[in-house]
A protein has these predicted regions:
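Short, solvent-exposed loop/turn elements at beta->coil junctions and helix N-caps
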Residues: 59, 125-129, 154-155
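Conserved small/polar residues in nucleotide/adenosyl-binding loops
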Residues: 197-198
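Active-site-adjacent elements of ketosynthase-type condensing enzymes
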Residues: 128-136
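Helix-loop "lid/cap" segments that line or gate small-molecule binding pockets
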Residues: 92-100
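A structural signal for short hydrophobic beta-strand segments in well-ordered beta-sheet cores
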Residues: 138-140
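A short core secondary-structure module
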Residues: 146, 150-193
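Amphipathic, small/basic residue-rich leader segments at the start of a protein or domain
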Residues: 1-87, 98, 104-115, 119
Length: 198
């Protein structure tokens, strides 16, 4: 791989693709989250270029870059003041689905994650169960091919924008607290789901 040439191709793309508004959103990013509208607009441009998920292999829609290409891309994005992307799905859920998901789940969720059609939030913390996830109380009871989920999640980053949530729930109360926890993917427009922003 000609890394200097790759760096130039990244710079050229960033020069063309980053509007003044997107650069300004990047400048104003103070943590890992950029302005949502800017992040989604930037995600769509990177998706069209095939660069939205630098760590993902080609078989799942990533560019298949090696570690040096990923480092160059990240460095050039920072130097150009690119905003972040909508990352909860791509960086947190995507790699887990690639490894543990069924073929149907991979086929359904991964492309929508990359395109920005699905915006994900994380449903781990609860009142009384912040970093101590073994204390979580949200329950999920099997109902045919579905689950009936009852409980509350808090500190749910991106919930105000999300249409999907990956969620830890208790499915077995007969075992020790660290066991009996399952990982569910839930559509936030499911009946009975309510989201509050403070």
């Amino acid at each position: 791989i000609d890394y200097p040439a790759f760096r130039e191709s990244v710079r050229d793309f960033l020069h063309e693709a980053l509007t003044p508004e997107l650069r300004r959103a990047g400048e104003l990013t103070t943590s890992v989250f950029s302005d949502f509208d800017a992040a989604l607009a930037w995600q769509k441009k990177l998706h069209a270029q095939g660069w939205i998920a630098p760590d993902w292999p080609k078989e799942f829609g990533g560019p298949g870059w090696d570690i040096q290409q990923r480092a160059i891309f990240q460095e050039e994005c920072k130097l150009a003041n690119a905003p972040s992307v909508v990352m909860m799905g791509i960086q947190m859920l995507g790699p887990m689905l690639m490894h543990y998901g069924t073929e149907d789940q991979k086929h359904h969720y991964l492309p929508r994650m990359l395109s920005g059609e699905h915006i994900w939030c994380q449903g781990y913390s609860e009142p009384g169960a912040g970093s101590d996830l073994a204390s979580l109380k949200t329950s999920a009871i099997r109902d045919g091919s579905d689950y009936l989920v009852t409980g509350t999640k808090i500190w749910t980053s991106m919930a105000q924008h999300a249409n999907q949530i990956f969620c830890l729930v208790r499915t077995d109360k007969s075992v020790k607290p660290q066991a009996g926890i399952s990982f569910l993917l839930i559509e936030l427009d499911s009946p009975g789901t309510v989201s509050y922003t403070h």
